[in-house]
């Protein structure tokens, strides 16, 4: 299963959060600094159980203000 976890961090803390994410084994290597309503996006490709664990673990990082996780939905578009 794939998911996109959008992370908002405290002002000036993007680099600090990136360093923390690098040290976490379960977090994907697909980590991007983005503009818009999120500061950082992480692409997760694992089971829904592991996605839940990762997102809950992110809540323990004090520099993270909020997260929003978009879960992949399988849709048959008939193409």
Language-model features, listed with the residues they occupy:
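A compositional/biophysical signature of low hydrophobicity enriched in polar/charged and small residues
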Residues: 1-79
């Amino acid at each position: 299963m794939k998911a996109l976890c959008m992370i908002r961090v405290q002002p000036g803390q993007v680099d600090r959060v990136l360093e923390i994410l690098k040290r976490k084994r379960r977090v994907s290597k697909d980590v991007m600094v983005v503009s818009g309503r999120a500061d950082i996006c992480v692409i997760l490709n694992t089971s829904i159980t592991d996605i839940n664990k990762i997102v809950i673990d992110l809540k323990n990082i004090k520099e993270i203000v909020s997260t929003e996780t978009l879960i992949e939905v399988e849709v048959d578009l008939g193409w």
